[in-house]
């Protein structure tokens, strides 16, 4: 999954996305024992408006997956009391928004479909559905594809049209070049199982590769797109919302994921995730830590110090935010391309190149990047870098993030982009036509003009973030209701400041 380039360019300076651009943050509930209300996409997240570091007094619940209320119009004030009639109507609405076929029905239909002769295997492009003979009359006027082969069934991402709504799915799929590289790299690194979170095309590539002689890897796809339910059996796909750790098919699906992660005491498995870039980093980090905790449950005591290997695929300018929550992660120079997005394809120079990178806790010296695509090994950094990424003797690192050769600024004491110059007014490097310090510049948290939000001393550090996760882990052991536990995690504000617990006790009076 990915997001449109026009959004990415505007986000590069901030290092966060989606609601944050409009001054909205994920918040902790005033009452930690209250479960989050449900929308069609599972438990909602709690948000609060922030203006120059000051939180509005009234928080609200909104959908975790959809950033546009046209796609999911759920809205509820945190302190709002709903009547039984409204709660009942909401439950009915949530049920109506679910897919027309259950997971069990999809599996039953799939098993029947593959038994049909080739001439009777049809796919409705209009409804995005595999058709059985009994369905033909109902879909007679629709656009159909006939003679669906076994090979086509193995590549559903090529049968299904991408969900390209920018603010909801932003479903851009790995290009074959990147997909084959990732699958080959995972095999070279010796992994036998891959948990693909929001990476359907990699899931397909691994399954196709496993059917040959090259690799015996297995894959489990977790994805919010219900259309994949009709192409996979129980052990290959779970419908899942990565922003709130919600399994749409309940405990049975959760157990599938748990068994997959804990097989062989958790050895030989890696998680590869490709979240929508418009999503907030904090909820994703909380979800991934829950998957890590699930994996750790299956480990022996001798392996308790080990980390679940992860490939998190995201734009390079989210580096500081990701490393805040996962300090052991590093960013690789490899540029990940997307098939159905012209600006995410491999280019020959600088800004034509994809901004998408791999963040991982796998040691970078173990990861070989293809020399034929312009990568070389830096003996000083002990990792592969892009050809233009030159080693800086002052920084003692290959510093480029975007594929261009960066220049060292002695005043800033770091390397900067070649298009930037040092501004004496701002005392930092920036684009030549930037606006100097003013009301629109500075920190979104504390209002100071000498730094951005991502570098604010008041924002939670990785230590604080991990401590907060531990706090919610403690609550998880105390509480038994899984949906309630998910609400606790999903309503977490990781960037708490020194006033954190006092903010929780503030009374809510008005909303501006």
Curated annotation (Swiss-Prot):
Binding positions (Zn(2+) 5): 409, 412, 422, 429
Transmembrane segments annotated in the record for this chain: none
Binding site for Zn(2+) 1: 39, 41, 63, 72
Keyword terms: Cytoplasm, Metal-binding, Methyltransferase, Nucleus, S-adenosyl-L-methionine, Transferase, Zinc, Zinc-finger
Zinc finger motifs (GRF-type), residue ranges: 39-81
Binding site for Zn(2+) 2: 124, 127, 139, 142
GO BP term, pick one: positive regulation of translation
EC nos: 2.1.1.-
Enzyme class, first EC level, given as a word: transferase
Entry binding sites for Zn(2+) 3: 378, 381, 391, 398
Family per similarity comment: Belongs to the ZCCHC4 family.
Protein name from the UniProt record: rRNA N(6)-adenosine-methyltransferase ZCCHC4
């Amino acid at each position: 999954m990915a997001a449109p380039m026009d959004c990415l360019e505007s986000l590069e300076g901030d290092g966060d996305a989606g609601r944050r651009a409009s001054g909205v943050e994920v918040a902790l509930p005033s009452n930690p024992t209250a479960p989050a209300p449900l929308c069609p996409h599972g438990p909602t997240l709690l948000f609060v408006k922030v203006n120059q570091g000051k939180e509005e007094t009234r928080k609200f619940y909104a959908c975790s997956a959809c950033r546009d209320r046209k796609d999911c119009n759920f809205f509820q004030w945190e302190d709002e009391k709903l009547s039984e009639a409204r709660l009942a109507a909401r439950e009915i609405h949530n049920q109506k928004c679910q897919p027309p076929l259950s997971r069990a029905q999809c599996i039953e239909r799939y098993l029947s479909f593959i038994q049909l002769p080739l001439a009777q295997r049809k796919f409705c492009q209009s409804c995005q559905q595999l058709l059985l003979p009994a369905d033909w009359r109902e879909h007679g006027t629709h656009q159909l594809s006939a003679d669906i082969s076994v090979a086509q069934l193995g590549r559903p991402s090529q049968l299904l049209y991408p969900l390209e709504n920018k603010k909801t799915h932003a479903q851009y799929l790995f290009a074959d070049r990147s997909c084959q590289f990732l699958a080959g790299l995972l095999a070279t690194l010796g992994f036998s199982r891959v948990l693909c979170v929001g990476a359907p095309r990699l899931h397909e590539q691994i399954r196709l590769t496993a059917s040959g002689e090259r690799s015996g890897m297995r894959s489990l796809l977790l994805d919010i797109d219900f259309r994949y339910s009709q192409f996979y059996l129980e052990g290959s796909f779970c419908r899942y919302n990565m922003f709130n750790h919600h399994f749409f098919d309940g405990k049975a699906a959760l157990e599938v994921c748990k068994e997959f992660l804990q097989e062989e005491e958790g050895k030989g498995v890696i998680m590869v995730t490709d979240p929508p870039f418009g999503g907030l980093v904090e909820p994703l980090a909380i979800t991934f830590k829950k998957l890590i905790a699930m994996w750790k449950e299956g480990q022996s005591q001798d392996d308790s110090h080990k980390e679940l290997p992860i490939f998190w695929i995201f734009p390079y300018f989210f580096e500081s935010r990701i490393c805040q929550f996962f300090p052991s992660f590093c960013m690789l120079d490899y540029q990940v391309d997307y098939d159905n997005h012209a600006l995410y394809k491999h280019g020959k120079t600088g800004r034509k190149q994809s901004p998408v990178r791999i963040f991982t806790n796998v040691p970078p010296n173990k990861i070989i990047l293809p020399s034929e695509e312009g990568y070389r090994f830096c003996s000083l950094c002990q990792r592969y870098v892009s050809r233009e990424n030159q080693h800086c003797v002052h920084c003692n690192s290959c510093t480029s993030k975007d594929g261009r050769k960066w220049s060292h600024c002695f005043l800033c004491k770091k390397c900067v982009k070649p298009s930037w110059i040092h501004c004496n007014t701002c005392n930092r490097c920036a684009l030549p036509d930037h606006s100097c310090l003013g009301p629109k510049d500075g920190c979104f948290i504390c209002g100071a003009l000498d730094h951005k939000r991502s570098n604010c001393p008041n924002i939670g550090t990785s230590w604080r973030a991990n401590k907060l996760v531990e706090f919610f882990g403690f609550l998880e052991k105390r509480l038994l209701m899984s949906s309630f536990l998910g609400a606790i995690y999903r309503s977490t504000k990781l960037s708490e400041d020194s006033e954190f617990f006092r903010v929780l006790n503030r009374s809510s009076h008005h909303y501006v």
